[in-house]
Each structure stands twice: as structure tokens, then as C-alpha cells.
Amino acid sequence: MSCCDLAAAGQLGKASIMASDCEPALNQAEGRNPTLERYLGALREAKNDSEQFAALLLVTKAVKAGDIDAKTRRRIFDAVGFTFPNRLLTTKEAPDGCPDHVLRALGVALLACFCSDPELAAHPQVLNKIPILSTFLTARGDPDDAARRSMIDDTYQCLTAVAGTPRGPRHLIAGGTVSALCQAYLGHGYGFDQALALLVGLLAAAETQCWKEAEPDLLAVLRGLSEDFQKAEDASKFELCQLLPLFLPPTTVPPECYRDLQAGLARILGSKLSSWQRNPALKLAARLAHACGSDWIPAGSSGSKFLALLVNLACVEVRLALEETGTEVKEDVVTACYALMELGIQECTRCEQSLLKEPQKVQLVSVMKEAIGAVIHYLLQVGSEKQKEPFVFASVRILGAWLAEETSSLRKEVCQLLPFLVRYAKTLYEEAEEANDLSQQVANLAISPTTPGPTWPGDALRLLLPGWCHLTVEDGPREILIKEGAPSLLCKYFLQQWELTSPGHDTSVLPDSVEIGLQTCCHIFLNLVVTAPGLIKRDACFTSLMNTLMTSLPALVQQQGRLLLAANVATLGLLMARLLSTSPALQGTPASRGFFAAAILFLSQSHVARATPGSDQAVLALSPEYEGIWADLQELWFLGMQAFTGCVPLLPWLAPAALRSRWPQELLQLLGSVSPNSVKPEMVAAYQGVLVELARANRLCREAMRLQAGEETASHYRMAALEQCLSEP
């Protein structure tokens, strides 16, 4: 059979591509095409390659393009099977005068015909061809060769059909298809547009796996698309706006793409546009803000103007969408605008290296205040039937980001919304799995049609904690929160989150958000201890909280890198112990003794004596572990010292326990070994408070202090109260 005959046989694949499953079947049981049936019989009975080729030619003549329905394709497959196409794809020897790619083209055409059937597209015999099919996309050859072009089209037909099966994307990724598609697109050869379309589909279906298998190639495509975006002057720039979010990596966008992406967006957003042109640009900017913060925006005047433009546009969109009741909300666009507003909040509150100048910050705070007012207006209209919708979650998130930094403005509106926020947080807390699913839906809604990199927190309560921390200081909002049951909810939440730090969990991979959430809860409880002590005494949830603090602190203070959390737990527990001192749990039980021993450890290890060159006397200095975080720690430490001092007269067993720990003796020894001039007055006051109460509470403590030169040390540091106490019998 000649090479021309082989090429003609390849027309079977052409017919298959043009065929449609929806067209009426040609071969119903009572009216099959007799000629086609005869040729299919010949195909089934063929004894060698030549007879099979001849039969294929006859079949293509009997079946006109577009006439092959699903049943006919299946009967052709039953007649041909996979063996013959397999041989065509792998043959090394072609007939004289026939290019070897013509045989492969016929093999691919047959596969393309078969892949029109979804069952066959998922067949192992098709799946194991993925690696060889992928190589055809990047094979060198004459770009004008019709047979080669036909083979490339058929290859894309096969791969696209496989991608449409349930497990197809996974097989394509494992078979090297993503890299091949990237190279085919970057080569801009025949069919490169089909490569891009298939890449988009695979990224949408399995983004993480795609990046894991082909990150360098995908980054090369991103660089190419970014350059095209920056240069585009026609409508293609709007198409690229929709494509680019799909090609941003789940971790960090390469810095070399920043300039092109920002320049392209600045050109689009700085023009007068319709909403269909502007919205994809806002969504791309939101994805970049979510992945990179403000790193992709250049410093200087142009960058600050661009950032201000982004935030202003976002605020306008939010107000237009949410202020008018009954208006259909483009939730994906508004959620993207929320991400840009959050970027604006971060930059407005940044003290160092902010992109914004002070007048710009003032202007943006004003427009964001108006947009947040629209968000509050929207949330006040939300009924219980909508509480589980992703857009509501996104709206609560941006409100939480605002309240974390600003609670003085919109106070009336915020107080009006607080009951809803408490109920909403409680609903999602009680249905944690649905809340986690909501976070993913919000991320998908906000950033792109595919799964984004960093996911947003999965519980509404964590989003609201910083704002509630500020609000519990104020009388009005605090009363509303207490009335709505927020303290009880916070206690339950704290206990649930604390379980993640228990020995049964791998705390080395504990998300930072969990620890930050626990610390913020502690700050809220500290506010309540100071401003609403009666609540602590009467609400049973705080008794449970106290028990958890007591049992947890001993292990926590021993863990590396968790000193700040330990400080929060110790200080909160000491302050609560003063209010709950009559509780049976605090009457010298093993748990209470363990807690106070751990609290003493935290308080006693903060400072050390440090030698100074050229001086005989050491100075009081922070211990290495405390030094790096003392700015965040010192307020808790001083508050903890004060709270411990207050506990001593309330708990008779505490002074003997402190004596057994040798803290008072070691404290006096430390003060005696350093220069008094190196000890700040506030430190002297804190140390004297503890020593005086211990001395007053227990005779053995007084004797131990005298033996440690306590009176002399008190005199050196002008601790009059301690000196007087130690001079008494």
C-alpha cells in the first residue's frame, strides 16, 4: 500500500473529529448501512496490515464526515481494537517513500476517533499512550506539513478527551503533559493556542499537582504571559487579565513578573473602562495582593498612586454593590475588592516602609470607612438562610480586618451589628466542617476560578478576635458582647483551639494563626478580668478555662519558641486566680501547685546578671530567650508579677511553695550580684512587691530572706517596705 493510501486512511480520524454524539444514529438496528457493515466485516476479518489498511480506506469512503455516531464509532473500535493503533504509534519502519510520521498520524487519528467515547478515553490503553502523545506536541518537523498538523490536532483531541474524564487530569500530569503543553505554547508552533486552552483546564482541575510536577515550565509560561500583558495594546490585554490568575503559582509570584503585571494593570485601570473590562483587572490585582501583599507594587510616587487607585476603585465597587438593597451583587468582583481593601488597611497601618504618604493614608481611610459602612449595611440585611454563603463569610472577613485596626469610627453601626456577629460566629463554630469548606469557597470566589495558594482562615471567630479585643475595652460594646454570650463562646473556642497544642498533636507544624488566635483570646479575657471581674466569678465557663490554664502551663513553659503564648497563659491564670481564689481547684491541688511553679519559672527566668568589660560589677540584663521579644512580653511580665503578688495573701500555701522553689532567695542573690544602677525603678518596684508579700505571708520566708542578706539588699535598692518587713520578728 502506498504512502498516499496511508494518508487517505487517516481521513477516518478527520471524520471522527467532526462527528457529534448528538447527531442521529446512522445505523439503527433495522436500517444499518449495508455497505458500511460489509466493510466493517472486512476490517474485523483482516489478516495482515495491508488488509487492515484497505478495509480502513473502504470504511472512510462509506462513512461521510459527520455521519459517525457513538454506536458506529464503537463498532469501528470493536473491529480495530488497540493493537493496530499501538503498532502505528511505535513503528520504526515505514514503507518506502512514506515519512514515518504519517503512520503515527494514522495511529493518533484512530485514537482520536476512539476517545470521542468517554469510556474509551479513560481506557488503560489510551492512558498509557499519554507520554508518547505528549512528545508529539513538541516534536520538530515541517510546520506546513498537512499530515503533521493533522496529527497535532488529533493529539490535542485525545488529550482533551482524557482531561474530561474523572481521573484524566491526574494521569496527564503524571505523564508529563503539563511540561509538554508549556513547551508547545512557548514555542508558538502550530496548535499552541490549543496547548494554552488545555493548560487552563488542567490548572483549574488540579492546580497543586500541576505546579508540583512542572513548576519551571509553568513559571516560563507565566513570564511569557506577563510580558505579553505588559505589551498588549489591543483587546487581548483583557483576555490575558482573565488568564493570568490561573497561572499565578500557589506560593510566591516570581519577582521578575512584578513589573510587567503591575504596568499592565496600571494601564488598564487608569483608563475609562466598562465593568466587563475593569472587573477582570480588579480580580487579577486581588490575586496578586493575596499572594504577594504589596511587594509587586513598586516603591515611589508611581507605586503609591497605583495603590491608592486600586483601593479607591475597590471601595467604589463595594459601595455601588452593597448600598442599594435589591441590586444584584457580583460577588466574585466584590470579594476581590475586599482583598484590595485589606491591602489598603495593611498599608495604612504600616509605620515603616509604607508605599503610601500620610495624605494618601488619610484619604484612603476615609473612603474605606464609607465602604465598610456599606458592608455593615449589607450584613444587617442578611437573614439566617444566607449565613452559610461564602460571600457573607468574605464580608465578615473584611469587617474583621477593619475592626482589628479601627473601632472608634462607625461605633454606632458596629454596636448595632455585634449581635449578628456573635450569632454568626457561633453558628460557624458549631458547624466547623462547614466553616472550613466556606473558607475554600470564599478563596475560590475571591481570587480565581481555581484553587488559590494561601487559604483564608476557616472560622469566622478568628477573624473577629482582634476587633473584639479592642471592643471589650469599651463599656458599650463590651456590654453587648457579654449580653449576647460572647465570653462563653470565646471560652469554648479557646478550649477547642488549645487541644491543637496538646501532646497528641504535632505542635511543630501548628499554624501561626492558631497560636495568634490563642494569644488574642487571652488578651480579651484579660480585658474582661479587669473590666468585668464579676463575670469571671459567676460564669462557669471561666472555671473550666482556669482548669485548662493550670494543667497546660507546666508543659508550655518548657517548649522552645512558645514563650509569648506561655506569658499570656501565665498572666491570665494569675489574674484569674485572684478572682477565683476560693475555688476548690486553687486550694493547693496538684494542678494549682504545678501552675504556680510554672508561673514562677516564667517570672524568674526573665533577667540574669551579665558581666560588663572593665567593671567589677555585673549588670541586670534580659536573658537571651526573653530579649528578642521583650517589647511584646514586658507588659505581660509586669502584670504577671503584680498578679502573683496579689495571689500570695489569698492562697496560704503559695508562700511556702515559692520558698521551696527558692525564687525569693535567688531573686535576692541576683539583686545582690548586680549594680543597683542597672536596675530600673519599675523593676525594683516589681521585685519588692513580690518579696514583701512573701515575707509578710510566711515566717520561714522572712528567715530565708534574712539569711540571703535581704535587709542589706533592700537598703541598697531603697526598698523601704521590704527593709521594714524583714526587720520585724
UniProtKB/Swiss-Prot annotation:
Lineage top rank: taxon: Eukaryota
SUPFAM superfamilies membership: ARM repeat
A Pfam family it matches: Neurochondrin
Asymmetric dimethylarginine PTM sites in chain numbering: 75
Keyword Signal belongs to the record: no
Example GO BP: regulation of postsynaptic neurotransmitter receptor internalization
Keyword Acetylation annotated: yes
Gene Ontology terms: cellular component: cytosol; dendrite; endosome membrane; glutamatergic synapse; membrane; neuronal cell body; perikaryon; postsynapse
Main location (coarse class): cytoplasm
Entry keyword set: Acetylation, Cell projection, Cytoplasm, Disease variant, Endosome, Epilepsy, Intellectual disability, Lipoprotein, Membrane, Methylation, Palmitate, Phosphoprotein, Synapse
Designated name of the protein: Neurochondrin
